[in-house]
Amino acid sequence: MNHHTRPVLLVLGAGDRAYRSFLLQEFAARHHLVLLDDQVPAWTRPYVTDTVTVDLHDHQAVHRAVTEIALRQPITGVTTYLEHHVELVARLAKELGLPGADPDAVAACRDKARTRQLLAEHGVPSARSVLVNSADEAVAAAAAIGYPVVIKPRGLGGSAGVHRADYREHVSAHYDNAAAATLIGLEASAVAGVLVEEYLHGPEISVECAVRGRGDVHIAAITRKRLGSEPAFLETGHLVDATDPLLDDPALHHVVTSAIKAVGITTGILHVEVRLTRQGPRIIEINARLGGDLIPLLVHLATGISLPQAQAALATGDTPDLAGSVAQSAAIEFRYPTVTGPVQAAHARAFTADWLERLFWTRQSGDVVVAGPHSTINDRLAHAIVSGPTPDACQARLDQVMQSLTVHITSPVRTTACVR
C-alpha cells in the first residue's frame, strides 16, 4: 500500500507499552494513525502520524477534538484496544457514519449483568447470575444459587475483584472486595454493582473472533488459559496452538456465535471467554475488543494472523485478512512475586534462543509488589513469550526461561491496590 494513500484511523488511548506496543505497531502497518489520549506516551511516536491531547473521560471534549480532526483530513475509521473506551468508539463511529458496532451492543458487553440477561433471554449457555447491592443480598443470592459461587464486579476486567466463595462467611468479605475493586482507571467508566454467579467447573479458554456481519463469526484462534490458585482467578499464562482441535468444534462455534448474536455485535474483533464444562461450553464474558495479555501477539506468532490489522480493517470498512500463514504454538507466562515488599533486584541469566520471542520486566527496583493470595495483575514482575512446534514444547521452553530469572524482594510491607 502506498504510504500517501493509507487511510486515517483514529485510535483512542495508548495504554501500557509492555502490553500494547504490538497492537499500535500493527495498526500503523496499513494506516495513518491519529492518537487521542490524556497524555501521549513517548513510546507511541514511531507509530503515529499525529497526536491530540484530550481527556478521554470528557466525551464532549473528545467530540470537539474529533470534529476538528475531521475538518483537516478525512477520517476512515475509529478504534481502540482499551476496554475503557470501547463504548465511546462505538458512539463516535455511529455519529461519524463510519463502520462500527452498535453502541448499545458494546455497552451490553461492558455490563456483565446485561450480558447475562441477554444470554438468558436467547437461551445461550452461561452462568446463573444475580446482581446485588449489599453483602446481605450477596449472601442470599449465594444461598439461592448454591455453593461454590463467584463474586465479581459488574463492570471491571483483568480478574480484578473476582473471587470464589465456598462458604457463607466468605461471601461478605468477597462482596466488599468486589465493590471496592479498581483496575487502571477502568472503574471510572464502569457500571457499578456486584454479581454473584454460579461457579462453572472446567478449563477456561478464550475464543478470538472476527465478526463480519450478524451471525457471521470467524474463529481465528483458541487461547488456552492458565489460572492461578483459587479463590482468585489471576491469569498466569496463555497458549495458542494453530491446530487446536477446538477450532473445528461445532458446539463451541454454535455457543460463541449465539452469544455474539444475543448481545447484538455485528462487526469487530471480539475476545470471548468460555468455560468447558461437562454440560458443554458456557459463556463467561464477551469483550468487544482485542484480547489483552498479549494474546494477539501469540495468535500472530502461532498462525500468522494479525488480529490488530483485522480490527483496523473492519473499523475502516475493509475486508480483514484472516488467512493463516504459520502453523505452530506460542505461549506466554507471567512471573508473580512469592513475597510482598519492594523489589530490590531483578535479573535474568544470559539467555539466547530463536524461540524466545520476548522477555520483558514489568517491575523494576523499588517497585512494591504483593504476593498471593492478594496479587493483582499490577504485581506481575515479568513475562516471557516463546514459540514452538507444540504446546508441550512451548511449556518446556517457558520453564527454562522462568528458571533463568532471579528476583530479590524485601518483606514485609502493606499491600497496595491495582493501579497499572
Predicted regions and their residues:
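ATP-binding N-terminal substructure of ATP-dependent carboxylate-amine bond-forming enzymes
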Residues: M1-A105, D136, Q364-V370, H374-D379, ...
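ATP-dependent carboxylate/phosphate-activation module, predominantly the ATP-grasp catalytic core
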Residues: V191, E198-I265, I269, L276, ...
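Short, well-ordered beta-strand elements within core beta-sheets of diverse protein domains
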Residues: H163, E198, D241, H300, ...
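Peripheral (often C-terminal) accessory segments that flank ATP-dependent C-N-forming ligase machineries
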Residues: L33, E121, A312-R420
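Conserved ATP-binding module of the ATP-grasp superfamily
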Residues: P125-A127, P148-I151, D166-G202, G237, ...
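Short beta-strand-to-turn element immediately C-terminal to the catalytic PLP-Schiff-base lysine
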Residues: V132, V162-Y167, A210-R212
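A conserved helix-loop-beta module that forms one wall/lid of the active-site cleft
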Residues: E95-G161, L183-G185
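ATP-grasp fold ATP-binding core
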Residues: L119, A142-A165, L183-G202, V207, ...
